[in-house]
């Protein structure tokens, strides 16, 4: 294919002009007869024309879309005119709509005239004649008479100022006089150059300086603080020369408050960053270097510079401006200046610190901290500060009576608070948590609003008035008590929705089989099983556990149904229980608060009002069954050794409620929970407590452990005949026909503890048991046994540290405890865990030291009795999760009361018989200490003999025969030192003693003797 280029256009010839065809055409062209214009030229012209048309069409199509898009702009630009802006920029200026309309109307008129002319009838001109006689005459445009102007001529006369022309000397003299006048009258001076510079004369340290206004005085931190041209600089230097410009400044004389001062840089002793050597305009200091205001600094340096501005003056100016704007405009007298200005400033500062205490008035953190404080925090923190400022103003500024009156009122307003918390508590207790209906809701709201005291807002006052109005309306409308509803209309159906126990649904507390994992709770639950449950001996059968006796009757368990038969008929008989006496729904089944039923504290009924009677409850093995009125949930009991089965002791069935609460207890609180139940609640509940006492105990636990409020209860059966509640455990119930209590959670059971609840069931008994009383003598014996047994002592220190206080019953026990180092070890253990226990053990150590100084037993007991009151006050501190705590408190209180009584008797001249009895107690306890010490000495002797035997066996073989006798003497002396007993020589011993002690003197048969000592050591350890 051939290509021909026309200018910038490239033409590709088609196949007709191939190279072969071109050669053939060229040969033909060389012939003379074919020298005319060939077809090749025509083809080239056609191809070129085609390319040009293609280019033009492509160009037109390329610009067509843009032209259509910009057509509105072109149409608008048609009526725009070009203008020239600054720097020769020419642009279009849009015309107004009025101008465009006028232009379009003119174009329309012209087009219309042209159209009428073109389309009008033809006019034929036959001839054109010219009158040559008449010459063309110029006719002037007719004169238009101008109307007279009636405008008033301006009377303003243009003033033309004559230019002031001065010589250099006259100008200098003029500026000096201006400077002298400004200096004398304190006027500002403005120097107008490229930029305006304002200055004035000011006094600092009895010296007059010329001061310019720099930009950082306005609060900004620019890079250039002041810009001066050369002419302004000369004038500024002339004004500075009229002040103490040439004063020599020592190091440190340029201080804050001198921003903008014009000084001589030659007379400055401080290191400085100068702009030139003619002037130095103070800006501030950066890294101990003075900075000139004209010097350019970076943005970082401008923030780091310590500017020498005068904040006090700015504060004074701001205070003055605001005071003048806010002062009273209308007064009944003429205001005069009677008080001292400085004292006014002092009092203003006192008032400022009283209202808004702060470290610095410019500190943003102080302002934010104060703004975030509540009214209670402000009152608690600053009430004493306000009182101090009031006292200062009263002592130093008594003439400011109005300020004293303001501070007094402000302090009284700050202290307006309702401190009658006792009445608030009583009202809340009398109303209770469940009374949400009127008028109790209004009373509760008024009680909550009044307790706020001075913190009540205007909205609170409005709400209190509204509630009081409702109470007045209620009291007005109530003319008689609401008639109580009939028992026949009482309905208390089971809820259709099952209670959701989130503790049993949490994946983190379930194992792979979906069973509840007790974790650390399993270990601490043993306190319940060890004290309140019996282990079922399967070999004896289940029959002995079927009948459960109570103070008012019996109930049969379904534990015998654990033995099941393969005979279906016999198995169906196990589904039949033993029917109890049938009771209809009566007042005994209901609980009321006021005139309303408290349904969770009532028995469950059917839809027709008949009571829901319990059916046979099948037993399970090692399960805790929770869920009272809903579907029961089976939780595996903590695992026991050998898969033993536990059953609550007679009267202990209510412990299952506390065991169910343990499910909701956090693992780290399980120890304190179980100890609180064991040591605090169960001793108070005693045997067969009432439901009211049990509910109160549950409320006590719910306060300490709020997560137990939604713990599910085991099924509780109501026996109205025996007036007793039965808490059903995993062994079910064979007795049927009892009523069922509706309460399903601990929070619902707590309602029985309210005094406002009218219910006969509050006095019903619940299963319980009596814990063995703490025996002081047994505990003292345990303490004596642990003195010389480190393992037992360690267990005592960790689990029952208050048992150490029982040593005050005997001086011998106290000193033995001190000499063994147990008190010191207890102090070291508890010093980082409980400061109270560490202080108690330290007091016992100090008491033991004082007791050791007394010579007689009565004197030792007197020392202990004198310190019993101090120990009692230190020990008694609320409730502690230790069994020995209450025992120690009671012991110390008894000793304290006995000592006070004995002092009274001694003062009256009576003798006390007790002085003859301490030796009897000491005689009873001292053998235990001696026996323990003898066992320790015996073990020590055995270990000593074993050590000496090992030494003798090892080293006598290596000695020379002549030196063995000397070695025997050395070993004999070592034994006498260790065992504190003199050892006889072998020559003076009997044959039996020689055989017994032969190990000490001869290495013969040492292995046999060692074996005999090992056997004796085992015997001693067993019997000690």
From Swiss-Prot:
Potyviral RNA is expressed as two polyproteins which undergo post-translational proteolytic processing. Genome polyprotein is processed by NIa-pro, P1 and HC-pro proteinases resulting in the production of at least ten individual proteins. P3N-PIPO is cleaved by P1 and HC-pro proteinases resulting in the production of three individual proteins. The P1 proteinase and the HC-pro cleave only their respective C-termini autocatalytically. GO terms for molecular function: cysteine-type endopeptidase activity; serine-type peptidase activity. The record marks 308-309, 767-768 as: Cleavage. InterPro entries: HC-pro, HC_PRO_CPD_dom, HC_PRO_CPD_sf, Pept_S30_P1_potyvir, Potyvirid-P3. Its EC number is 3.4.21.-, 3.4.22.45. The keyword Hydrolase applies. One of its GO terms (biological process) is viral translational frameshifting. It comes from the Viruses. Keywords: Host cell junction, Host-virus interaction, Hydrolase, Inhibition of host innate immune response by virus, Protease, Serine protease, Suppressor of RNA silencing, Transport, Viral immunoevasion, Viral movement protein. The keyword GTP-binding does not apply. Residues 645-767 form the Peptidase C6 domain. Pfam families: Peptidase_C6 (PF00851), Peptidase_S30 (PF01577), Potyvirid-P3 (PF13608). PROSITE patterns: HC_PRO_CPD, PV_P1_PRO. Residues 165-308 form the Peptidase S30 domain. One of its GO terms (cellular component) is host cell plasmodesma. A motif (Involved in interaction with stylet and aphid transmission) lies at residues 360-363. A motif (Involved in virions binding and aphid transmission) lies at residues 619-621. The active site is at residues 216, 225, 259, 653, 726. The N-terminus of helper component proteinase is involved in interaction with stylets. The central part is involved in interaction with virions and the C-terminus is involved in cell-to cell movement of the virus. Belongs to the potyviridae P3N-PIPO polyprotein family. This is P3N-PIPO polyprotein. It comes from Plum pox potyvirus (strain D).
């Amino acid at each position: 294919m051939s290509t021909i280029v026309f200018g910038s256009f490239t033409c590709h010839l088609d196949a007709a002009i191939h190279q072969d065809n071109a050669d053939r055409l060229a040969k033909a062209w060389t012939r003379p007869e074919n020298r005319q214009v060939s077809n090749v030229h025509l083809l080239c012209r056609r191809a070129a024309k085609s390319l040009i048309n293609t280019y033009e069409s492509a160009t037109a199509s390329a610009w067509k879309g843009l032209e259509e898009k910009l057509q509105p702009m072109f149409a608008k630009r048609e009526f725009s005119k070009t203008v020239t802006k600054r720097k020769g920029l020419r642009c279009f200026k849009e015309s107004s709509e009025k101008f465009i309309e006028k232009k379009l109307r003119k174009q329309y008129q012209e087009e219309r005239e042209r159209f009428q002319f073109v389309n009008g009838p033809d006019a034929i001109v036959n001839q054109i004649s010219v009158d040559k006689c008449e010459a063309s005459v110029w006719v002037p445009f007719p004169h238009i008479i101008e109307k007279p102007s009636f405008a008033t001529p301006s009377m303003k006369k243009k003033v033309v100022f004559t230019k002031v022309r001065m010589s250099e000397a006259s100008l200098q003299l003029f500026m000096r006089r201006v400077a002298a006048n400004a200096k004398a009258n304190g006027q500002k001076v403005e120097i107008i150059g490229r930029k305006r510079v304002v200055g004035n004369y000011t006094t600092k340290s009895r010296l007059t300086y010329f001061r310019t206004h720099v930009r950082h005085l306005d609060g900004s931190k620019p890079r250039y603080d002041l810009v001066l041209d050369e002419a302004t600089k000369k004038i500024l230097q002339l004004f500075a020369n009229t002040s103490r410009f040439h004063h020599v400044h020592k190091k440190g004389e340029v201080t804050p408050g001198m921003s903008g001062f014009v000084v001589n840089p030659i007379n400055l002793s401080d290191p400085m960053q100068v702009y030139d050597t003619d002037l130095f305009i103070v800006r501030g200091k950066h890294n101990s270097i003075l900075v000139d205001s004209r010097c350019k600094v970076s943005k970082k340096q401008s923030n780091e510079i310590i500017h020498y501005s005068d904040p006090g003056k700015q504060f004074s100016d701001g205070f003055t401006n605001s005071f003048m704007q806010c002062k009273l405009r209308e007064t009944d007298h003429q205001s005069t200046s009677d008080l001292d200005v400085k004292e006014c400033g002092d009092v203003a500062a006192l008032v400022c610190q009283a209202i808004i205490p702060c470290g610095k008035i410019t500190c943003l953190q102080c302002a934010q901290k104060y703004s975030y404080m509540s009214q209670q925090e402000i009152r608690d923190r600053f009430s004493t500060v306000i009182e101090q400022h009031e006292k200062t103003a009263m002592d130093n500024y008594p003439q400011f009576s109005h300020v004293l009156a303001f501070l007094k009122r402000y302090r009284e307003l700050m202290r307006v608070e309702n401190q009658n918390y006792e009445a608030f508590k009583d009202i809340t207790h009398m109303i209770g948590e469940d009374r949400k209906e009127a008028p109790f809701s209004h009373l509760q709201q008024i009680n909550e609003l009044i307790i706020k005291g001075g913190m009540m807002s205007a909205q609170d006052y409005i709400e209190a008035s509204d509630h009081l109005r409702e109470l007045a309306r209620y009291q007005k409308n109530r003319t008689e008590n609401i008639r109580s509803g009939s028992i026949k209309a009482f309905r208390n159906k089971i809820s259709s929705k099952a209670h959701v126990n989130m503790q049993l649904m949490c994946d983190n507390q379930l194992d792979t089989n979906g069973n509840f994992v007790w974790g650390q709770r399993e270990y601490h639950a043993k306190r319940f099983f060890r004290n309140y449950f019996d282990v079922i001996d399967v070999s004896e059968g289940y029959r002995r556990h079927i009948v459960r006796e109570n103070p008012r009757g019996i109930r049969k368990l379904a534990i015998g149904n654990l033995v099941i038969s393969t005979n279906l008929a016999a198995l169906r008989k196990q589904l039949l229980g033993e029917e109890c006496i049938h009771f209809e729904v009566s007042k005994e089944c209901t609980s009321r608060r006021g005139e309303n039923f408290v349904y969770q504290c009532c028995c469950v009924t059917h839809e027709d009002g008949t009571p829901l009677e319990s059916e046979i409850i099948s037993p399970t093995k090692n399960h805790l069954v929770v869920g009272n009125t809903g579907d029961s949930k089976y939780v595996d009991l903590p695992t026991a050794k050998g898969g033993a089965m536990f059953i609550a002791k007679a009267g202990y069935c209510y412990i299952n409620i506390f065991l169910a609460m343990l499910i909701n207890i956090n693992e780290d609180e399980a120890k304190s929970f179980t100890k609180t139940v064991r040591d605090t609640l169960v001793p108070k509940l005693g045997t067969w407590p009432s439901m009211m006492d049990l509910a109160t105990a549950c409320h006590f636990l719910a306060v300490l452990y709020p997560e137990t409020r939604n713990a599910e209860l085991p099924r509780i059966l109501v026996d109205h005949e025996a007036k007793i509640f039965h808490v059903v455990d995993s062994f079910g119930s064979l007795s049927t026909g009892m009523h069922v209590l509706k309460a399903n959670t601990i929070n619902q059971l707590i309602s029985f503890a309210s005094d406002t609840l009218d219910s006969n069931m509050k006095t019903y008994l619940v299963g319980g048991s009596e814990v063995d009383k703490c025996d002081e003598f047994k505990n003292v014996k345990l303490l004596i046994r642990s003195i010389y047994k480190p393992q037992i002592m360690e267990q005592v220190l960790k689990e029952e540290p208050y048992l150490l206080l029982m040593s005050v019953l005997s001086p011998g026990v106290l000193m033995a405890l001190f000499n063994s180092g147990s008190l010191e070890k207890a102090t070291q253990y508890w010093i980082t865990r409980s400061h109270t226990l560490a202080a108690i053990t330290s007091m016992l150590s100090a008491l033991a030291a004082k007791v050791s100084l007394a010579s007689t037993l009565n004197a030792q007991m007197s020392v202990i009795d004198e310190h019993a009151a101090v120990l009692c006050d230190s020990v008694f501190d609320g409730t502690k999760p230790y069994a020995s705590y209450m025992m120690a408190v009671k012991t110390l209180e008894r000793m304290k009361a006995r000592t006070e009584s004995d002092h009274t008797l001694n003062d009256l001249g009576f003798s006390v018989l007790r002085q003859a009895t301490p030796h009897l107690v000491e005689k009873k306890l001292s053998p235990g200490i001696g026996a323990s010490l003898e066992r320790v000495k015996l073990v020590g002797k055995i270990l000593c003999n074993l050590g000496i035997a090992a030494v003798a066996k090892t080293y006598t073989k290596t000695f020379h025969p002549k030196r063995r006798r000397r070695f025997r003497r050395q070993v004999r002396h070592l034994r006498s030192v260790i065992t504190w007993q003199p050892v006889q020589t072998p020559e003076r011993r009997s044959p039996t003693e020689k055989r017994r002690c032969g190990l000490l003197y001869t290495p013969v048969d040492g292995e046999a003797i060692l074996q005999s000592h090992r056997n004796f050591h085992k015997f001693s350890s067993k019997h000690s």
